[in-house]
Amino acid sequence: MDILSLGYAQARDATDRLADKRAEFLLPDGVIYLDGNSLGPLTHAASKAVQATLHSEWGTGLIRSWNDADWINLPETVGAKIAPLIGASPKNVIMADSTSVNLFKVLSAACAIQTGRKTIVTERLNFPTDNYIAEGVIRQMGQHHRLRYVEQSETLTACLDDDVAVVLLTHVNYRTGQMHDMAAVTKAAHERGALV
């Protein structure tokens, strides 16, 4: 049978062990949704959980739900559920704000404690959101800092000097797939007084 034929696809669908999973999602009829990297489709279970949170925990429980519904421990509870997916111990993972919000917080704090150092070093081909966040931190700090972009032809460690407060670097470049030797970069940055 031709693997590009409708018949082949239908035969494969009929024997797909995951075919029944489609019913777990709230998708409009006829929609094939393959763009789940940033916003997956809503599940029936998630919808019910949100409704319970809205109507019972928030609507009825009000502020008591921080304790009664254990909201206070959700960062640890959710982290423990994520831990096995990444091969970590449940006690070593915590759920927090988005990566972007956390990057803004940590970059702001790092720049603030690095008094006398005014440069953030990053790759020009770094994930765009990370660079936008660095630009936002600089604006927030009154334009007293500057962003130094490392070009592909340069080595990051060659850009480190006594004015570098922070090195902002993604372990794996999302465009090229290049993996940085973070231990070496961190060691070089720390030797020059910069944070990573």
Functional labels for PLM-detected ranges:
Residues 1-196:
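Pyridoxal 5′-phosphate
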